[in-house]
Amino acid sequence: MTLYDENNLHIIKDNLRYLKLLSKQYPSISSASSEIINLQAILNLPKGTEHFISDVHGEYESFTHMLKNASGVIKRKIDDVFGTSLRECDKKNLATLIYYPEQKLDLIKKSEKNLEDWYKITLYRLIRLCQIVSSKYTRSKVRKSLPSDFAYIIEELLNEQGDRVDKQEYYNSIIETIIDIDRASEFIIAISNVIQRLVVDKLHIIGDIYDRGPGAEIIIEALSKHHSIDIQWGNHDIVWMGAAAGCEACIANVIRISLRYANLSTLEDGYGINLLPLATFAMDFYKEDNCENFKPRTIDKNLNETDIKLLSKMHKAISIIQFKLEGKIIKRRPEFKMEERLLLDKINIKEGTLNLSEKIYKLIDTNFPTLDKENPYELNERERDLVEKLTNSFINSEKLQRHIKFLYSNGSLYLKYNSNLLYHGCIPLNEDGSLKEVTLCKETLKGKSLLDKLDRLAREAYFFKKDPESKLYGMDMMWYLWCGSNSPLFGKKKMTTFERYFLDDKNTHKEEKNPYYKYRNDEKMCTMIFEEFELDADNSHIINGHIPVKTKEGENPIKANGKLLVIDGGFCKAYQPQTGIAGYTLIYNSYGLLLTSHEPFSSIHKAIVEGNDILSSTTILEHVSSRKRVLDTDSGEEIKKQIHDLEMLLVAYRKGLIKEENEANIRF
């Protein structure tokens, strides 16, 4: 450490107002010096473990388990601590106990003959494991992670060695007393949760919490309780955020996707969205229509014929409303350049055809009872009334609004963190691999400036309630981020939803990807992006989601010689037959980067009862010769700045520029 140069008094004088404010927190040479010592010590601690997960798609059971087992980190810690001294079955049971302490304890109490003995052995093991996982943190940080009921006891046990002769009786008596007063179960639950918390210092969710899975609201509820998290919004997140902001086109899309996959639990049970008006509307207008192309796609769901018929009618009804609402945005925003997606006016109902890109296609469904051929994008009176009711439901759902505010507070379109660049979709590129310029609000933007602008507009969509014009533009932009040709979240030229419903020709269903995906394996592209985002190309990685890695076909998630890592989690069951696995997660600890591939998860019930974990295979991507310290991280840079400021404060005290507060007057 180099102390601040006392001769640079002009710098100190220039910052005197700030230093006087800082002196309120550190009112003496002694307190400022102590803090410098503390901060300098923290810099030399090992870097905390980061856990990267992407594309959860509402699959809450798989995600919950992944969160609890930290992509295998807890199992590896158990192996490190206990090695061959424990049988594999004992290690498995210990891991399951840490993941699901309440449920596992219920089972053990029913089957264990000598419960007190089991408690004693288990408590020793959990304390030993907790000592190891907490060893890279300061006592202060560990203390903050402890539950209030057991904070003092856990801290005592973590900081004492049970094999030390002079403290052995003290250590043992604590454990025996916990058992004697019938608090062992509560203590096991508490320390298991502490272990779960301490094994991961930072959680990164790289998009798509929402989609077709049944429990997005359960996932966000769990994430909102996490101690340290950031989120990079995905395309499915942004459409829900737009819906919560009141964007009617986003609301229609959210409902359509939910109906497409017969997943109404998130809407109805999770957020209390009333879909009865839509059901009534659909039965009135599509009563005689079997809506064959709108039958829900279901996995592991047993729906009766009556349910399927109703969902199909609702699905078609909201789809037509969606196309009308999207048409209004396209006409309102010519700068989006999406006129080719205006298809309702290209329908010839009499002939049963669609004029698409100057080519005539036969429609496989010609029943459009709400379509006015003179004004095809106008909602009829019943549709307008329905859209108003649905919009009110979304805007007035307390839980949905709370969850979306959480996404805004903890999320962004991209994140630079510890020399890594995290984003869900892509950075829009031209065919030649250069950054694509996009004109928004009369500004021509590309790369970082484009994403920064889109991030601001997404926030205006939700928060600018007193500026209707800015809010409307922001909401339109949320829809564009969902499906626009230059959206960094969508990453494709067009979304062919209409064609998939109404045309048989598979060629019309194709969605051409942005050239970014063609260049993902090119180190030069990665270097260009690193430079654009002001990152060191030699020591940085792009961590990406969105597109499932087709491992089954030999695709490698490691691109561009390790510069770009694709970790689409594969949580979505519909993708697993294509990918061959349940996707990838990433761990970045003080020793390097570990990429973990996962097999499909059975269920939480089987995990608890049978000890079934997610079968995972870990690849070491990078291994550093000397452990990374806090000083090598973004937090380290902030701490260095704090030390610099405190050193200036010390000089100000010693030169008499700021007077120390009398020790007797300092209130602790």
From Swiss-Prot:
One of its GO terms (molecular function) is fructose 1,6-bisphosphate 1-phosphatase activity. Disulfide bonds: none annotated. It comes from the Bacteria. It catalyses: beta-D-fructose 1,6-bisphosphate + H2O = beta-D-fructose 6-phosphate + phosphate. Its cofactor is Mn(2+). Pathway: Carbohydrate biosynthesis; gluconeogenesis. Keywords: Carbohydrate metabolism, Hydrolase, Manganese. Its EC number is 3.1.3.11. One of its GO terms (biological process) is gluconeogenesis. The keyword Ribosomal protein does not apply. It holds the Pfam family FBPase_2. It is an enzyme of class 3 (hydrolase). Belongs to the FBPase class 3 family. This is Fructose-1,6-bisphosphatase class 3.
